[in-house]
């Protein structure tokens, strides 16, 4: 695919807004108001790397009086979570990126050991990078008395590929389930339809991680491995 420069946070903004429109169409976005909608679209901490927020889940927090007050417990906890995420990103992910980039920059001459070091480095770099950004967003949100959803739950401790995707980028998985997989029929229309819906869902997840056919195939491969 050609290199295209996209606006910052376009994927998260698109996902949250499309989910909002679907919820309005379904009549599930109750008590919606222009003020609440403005608050929803101007929440900035999650726009870099998630989590994906849902209007129905965030609305009660917008309507609560405590959202507009200063709570020092939330402020302290938010700073701690933000610092933890920043440490993951800067001290771990960025350091692992050096090893990963070194391996991928000369793939034609890699030894067996170097290939494994590069693969493992990128595996953990991806996790600490994504989860670090998500924790920074959660911490920053908590400073504003907003509880954003948890996005990662020890995915590399998963017992299966399906369990892995329930732990990895959890808000993306929930979005795909609620607004793509289930509306397409889920597992209610026979085995072929179920596999088709799963395949489309996993390809969308793969494409979300990167705008290239390699990521699309990556998403489909995970499904094939689990099957």
Report residues per predicted region.
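Membrane-embedded transmembrane alpha-helical bundles that form the catalytic cores
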Residues: 1-227
